[in-house]
Amino acid sequence: MIEADRLIAATGPRDREEVQDRAIRPLSLADYIGQPTVREQMELFIQAARGRSESLDHTLIFGPPGLGKTTLANIIAQEMGVSIKSTSGPVLERPGDLAALLTNLEPHDVLFIDEIHRLSPIVEEVLYPAMEDFQLDIMIGEGPAARSIKLDLPPFTLVGATTRAGMLTNPLRDRFGIVQRLEFYSTADLATIVSRSAGILGLPLDPEGAFEIARRARGTPRIANRLLRRVRDFAEVRAKGHITKAVADLALNLLDVDEHGFDHQDRRLLLTMIEKFDGGPVGVDSLAAAISEERHTIEDVLEPYLIQQGYIMRTPRGRVVTRHAYLHFGLNIPSRLGEMPVVDEFLDAVDD
């Protein structure tokens, strides 16, 4: 499966959707909906940094895909009144790639590195003195004649974003003064986001229609906005352009997104665990082979929402479906589930 082909995939949008997303993306903390703790803390840190005429401390933002890490990075630059230069970990293959970005920064600018956990070790080593001392160590020459020179850099703010904070090395993680975790959004916050996006796009949308889209958006703004665009297509062709609860329900059912926000891939994963592995426990590699998927797709794309909603739990012996999965498909709950631990007990346990 190509992740971007899923309507409810939270991975990066396609080129045309990226243009539309930029149009509806909030540009200030005042317009930033949800994540109240993150918003309040960042407002405080930014106000303090501006009051001292300093650059904001280096900031790490992590959480599942589609929750607004890039949006928050752009808001930080906007609120600080500085420019932002964006790149991603896989793009920075050589130290020279990073050096070119750093030497072109103006004082207090923001350097945003998406997927920062994918930085190569050699590039990461160059980043350490840049973050800590605002200096760049560069090797000149080769062999015995090689020597290191130090270049002073203007004070800047590094904003790193990652979906896998656990893959960051300790030296890199320790150099971030501010660490923010983005959580899945509530349905109410998503409904507000959908209504705001519809207003910007000029779409007639009832509050009930916004709520119907929001509750199937898997707690993710990117998915909510993507569903809104597809429901708009349906409404323009079959409902005179007006999005009501009934229209949204018909459109999303046609798109195979059920009332819990599951698509065929989610249902396939759950049914495979129930039918082929007796509900688990099953190792992630065995599960990946059974549904012909990559391990990282299960861990980064499919699992997070299913775990957060209590349909799957991780135990020391592997993945296990909960009674909610059986109820979702109208199946009889095995008697052994009555003896299983509560869903939250093993969510953070290490898989074998």
Curated annotation (Swiss-Prot):
Keywords linked to the UniProt accession: ATP-binding, Cytoplasm, DNA damage, DNA recombination, DNA repair, DNA-binding, Hydrolase, Nucleotide-binding
Enzyme Commission numbers on file: 3.6.4.-
Keyword Transport: no
Residues annotated as binding ATP: I24, R25, G66, K69, T70, T71, E132, D133, F134, R175, Y185, R222
One Pfam match: AAA_lid_4
Chain positions recorded as Mg(2+) binding sites: T70
GO MF assignments: ATP binding; ATP hydrolysis activity; four-way junction DNA binding; four-way junction helicase activity
Localization (cell): Cytoplasm
Residues that bind DNA: R295, R314, R319
Catalytic activity: ATP + H2O = ADP + phosphate + H(+)
A single GO BP: DNA recombination
CDD domains associated with the record: AAA
Region of interest: Large ATPase domain (RuvB-L): 4-185
InterPro entries linked: AAA+_ATPase, AAA_lid_4, DNA_helicase_Holl-junc_RuvB, P-loop_NTPase, RuvB-like_N, RuvB_C, WH-like_DNA-bd_sf, WH_DNA-bd_sf
Region Head domain (RuvB-H): start-end pairs: 259-352
Residues covered by region (Small ATPAse domain (RuvB-S)): 186-256
Record's GO cellular component terms: cytoplasm; Holliday junction resolvase complex
Entry function: The RuvA-RuvB-RuvC complex processes Holliday junction (HJ) DNA during genetic recombination and DNA repair, while the RuvA-RuvB complex plays an important role in the rescue of blocked DNA replication forks via replication fork reversal (RFR). RuvA specifically binds to HJ cruciform DNA, conferring on it an open structure. The RuvB hexamer acts as an ATP-dependent pump, pulling dsDNA into and through the RuvAB complex. RuvB forms 2 homohexamers on either side of HJ DNA bound by 1 or 2 RuvA tetramers; 4 subunits per hexamer contact DNA at a time.
UniProt remark on domains: Has 3 domains, the large (RuvB-L) and small ATPase (RuvB-S) domains and the C-terminal head (RuvB-H) domain. The head domain binds DNA, while the ATPase domains jointly bind ATP, ADP or are empty depending on the state of the subunit in the translocation cycle. During a single DNA translocation step the structure of each domain remains the same, but their relative positions change.
Subunit structure of this chain's protein: Homohexamer. Forms an RuvA(8)-RuvB(12)-Holliday junction (HJ) complex. HJ DNA is sandwiched between 2 RuvA tetramers; dsDNA enters through RuvA and exits via RuvB. An RuvB hexamer assembles on each DNA strand where it exits the tetramer. Each RuvB hexamer is contacted by two RuvA subunits (via domain III) on 2 adjacent RuvB subunits; this complex drives branch migration. In the full resolvosome a probable DNA-RuvA(4)-RuvB(12)-RuvC(2) complex forms which resolves the HJ.
Similarity comment text for this entry: Belongs to the RuvB family.
Name of this chain's protein: Holliday junction branch migration complex subunit RuvB
Organism: Pseudomonas fluorescens (strain SBW25)
